[in-house]
């Protein structure tokens, strides 16, 4: 009798975050699973704003664990590690972690004498995507390893400098508040101008003059933006507000590369309606999102507000900005004016484009325990992991054909919602539910659904019935979305219909769609 070689037989799809089989305890005493080194590093990297404390780990402990894991894999698996770092800075949008990771990658490989795999120079260049980041990497290196900067680091930075330095970037990022000015970096790495950018040699010389002879430095004629900026700076203070209010004022500010951050200082006065309306056309999308409340307080016109709303809700702008979904919730809470609610809802939806529309019946569980509320996601955010979990869980439930949305902690409860309802409105229904009894939540709400998705930090409390994934029949997929990157998971993963993903963006949700279609999940940079 044929038992395996049948048309109905299908290999169980696998995923990349893999447990080792070793039993460890979660921070709350639950029976957890150790993950292999690559899996532990990936989950930590995609959820780790460097030096940010969490409920169970100090910022220093997390940073040390990240560096230790990365140094190990830089030597033993350099291709995988280089792929992670490039993806982390790009689609993963974890800027500081990628920069720190690149420095640790190079240091570990130089110390070990390793030469196989992607070059140190290539990895350094791959994580530097913004003009201020060469200085960030240099500052981290010298603070951690001293002022002797090895050649691969210098060459990688030089490659990035040729790609990133131009007139506007110099105005925005080459400021007196920086420890490493553009001129310092050019002196240190000896970057040659890009031969395809004939103006860059003059720009480099000007950056050096600005650093060493600021009173006599003259902007090059090959850079109209630097010349226009110098003209504005030379205007007497009493004449500056007229530039803002006169016809063509917005265009003149944009041509001079004057950012909204610099405008108030240049005016030496308040950012009133006229000032905001002049600078709004040249502001980036996320700068607009962060300043919605300021626009309301200044009384910007409905016409200007409509142009802001159109840009915020534009899918191409959202994709270009590469912002985390929780940024739009933060803006919604900070500026609850009705005129911003709809474009922010649109933007949030576009930022969750990879969240799948799952068929059949789905149980979605959102962790609202105390540890999820403990610390902010980043220095610039007032939101926490509980907020991020609610965003992802709600989006999953709304897009699924038939979903039960449950919040859990010490207790659990089902949340009601209507098809097509606003994600931002549903988020107001979530609460703070204390401890982390994930097992009981699943036992209370699993009623034969086709799959279970849990958005959590995985630090569940001991339960005599076992780990959360054991409460679901073995043939039913259980997907865990990890938002914290702690070492121990709440169940097995990688095979047998048990899968773990992670991060604060929607990027890895693509893997859910792969597995649902019977294909193996892959690391995001290999998908």
Would you name each region that the model predicts?
Residues 2-383, 398-527:
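Long lumenal/extracellular ectodomains of secretory and single-pass membrane proteins
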């Amino acid at each position: 009798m044929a038992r395996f070689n049948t048309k109905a037989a299908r290999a169980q799809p696998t995923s990349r975050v893999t447990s080792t089989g070793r039993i460890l305890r979660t921070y709350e005493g639950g029976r957890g699973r150790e993950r292999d080194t690559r899996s532990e590093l990936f989950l930590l990297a995609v959820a780790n704003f460097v030096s940010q404390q969490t409920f169970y780990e100090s910022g220093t402990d997390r940073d040390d664990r990240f560096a230790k894991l990365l140094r190990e894999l830089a030597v033993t698996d350099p291709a995988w590690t280089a792929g992670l770092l490039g993806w982390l800075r790009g689609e993963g949008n974890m800027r500081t972690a990628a920069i720190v990771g690149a420095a640790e990658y190079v240091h570990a490989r130089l110390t070990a004498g390793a030469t196989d795999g992607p070059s140190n120079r290539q990895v350094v260049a791959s994580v530097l995507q913004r003009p201020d980041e060469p200085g960030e990497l240099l500052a981290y290196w010298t603070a951690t390893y001293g002022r002797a900067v090895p050649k691969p680091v210098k060459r990688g930075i030089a490659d990035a400098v040729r790609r990133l330095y131009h007139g506007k970037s110099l105005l925005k990022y080459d400021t007196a508040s920086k420890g490493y000015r553009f001129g310092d970096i050019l002196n240190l790495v000896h970057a040659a101008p890009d031969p395809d950018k004939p103006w860059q040699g003059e720009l480099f010389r000007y950056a050096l003059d600005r650093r060493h002879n600021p009173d006599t430095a003259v902007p090059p004629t090959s850079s109209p933006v630097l010349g226009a900026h110098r003209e504005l700076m030379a205007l007497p203070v009493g004449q500056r507000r007229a530039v803002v209010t006169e016809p063509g004022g917005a265009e003149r500010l944009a041509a001079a590369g004057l950012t909204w951050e610099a405008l108030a200082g240049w005016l030496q006065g308040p950012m009133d309606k006229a000032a905001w309306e002049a600078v709004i056309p040249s502001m980036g999308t996320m700068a607009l999102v962060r300043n919605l409340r300021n626009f309301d307080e200044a009384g910007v016109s409905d016409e200007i507000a409509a142009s802001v709303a159109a840009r915020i809700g534009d899918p191409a702008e959202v994709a270009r900005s590469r912002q985390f979904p929780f940024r739009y919730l933060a803006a919604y809470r900070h500026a609850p004016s009705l005129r911003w609610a709809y474009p922010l809802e649109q933007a949030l939806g576009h930022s969750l484009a990879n969240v799948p529309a799952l068929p059949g019946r789905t149980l979605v569980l959102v962790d609202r325990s105390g540890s999820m509320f403990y610390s902010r996601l980043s220095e610039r955010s007032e939101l926490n992991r509980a907020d991020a979990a609610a965003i992802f869980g709600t989006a999953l439930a709304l897009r699924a054909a038939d979903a039960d949305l449950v919040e859990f902690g010490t207790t659990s409860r089902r949340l009601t919602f209507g098809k097509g309802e606003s994600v931002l409105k549903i988020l107001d229904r979530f609460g703070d539910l204390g401890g982390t009894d994930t097992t009981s939540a699943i036992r209370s709400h699993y009623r034969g659904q086709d799959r279970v998705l849990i958005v959590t930090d995985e630090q569940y409390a001991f339960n005599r019935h076992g780990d959360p994934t054991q409460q679901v029949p073995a043939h039913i997929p259980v997907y865990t979305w990890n938002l914290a990157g702690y070492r121990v998971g709440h169940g097995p993963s990688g095979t047998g219909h048990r899968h773990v993903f992670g991060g604060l963006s929607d990027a890895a949700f693509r893997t859910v769609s792969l597995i649902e279609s019977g294909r193996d999940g892959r690391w995001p940079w290999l998908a």
